[in-house]
Amino acid sequence: GLLSSLSSVAKHVLPHVVPVIAEHL
């Protein structure tokens, strides 16, 4: 379903996004 698609996308995206956000904090 849509939620499972979003969760799978989040699992791929978050590992790349979190370090970038952390650098700017």
Swiss-Prot record:
| Chief location | secreted
Q: Where in the cell is it found?
A: Secreted
One Pfam family, please name it. Caerin_1
Where in this protein does the record say Leucine amide is found?
Answer: L25
Q: Which InterPro entries match?
A: Caerin_1 (IPR010000)
Summary of the tissues where the protein is detected: Expressed by the skin parotoid and/or rostral glands.
Keywords, A to Z? Amidation, Amphibian defense peptide, Antibiotic, Antimicrobial, Secreted
User: Which GO biological process entries does UniProt record here?
Assistant: defense response to bacterium
The record's GO CC annotations read: extracellular region
Q: Which domain of life does this protein belong to?
A: Eukaryota
* Family, as annotated: Belongs to the frog skin active peptide (FSAP) family. Caerin subfamily.
Description of its domains: Contains two amphipathic alpha helix regions separated by a region of less-defined helicity and greater flexibility.
Biological function: Antibacterial peptide, that adopts an alpha helical conformation which can disrupt bacterial membranes. Each caerin displays a different antimicrobial specificity.
Q: What is this protein called?
A: Caerin-1.4
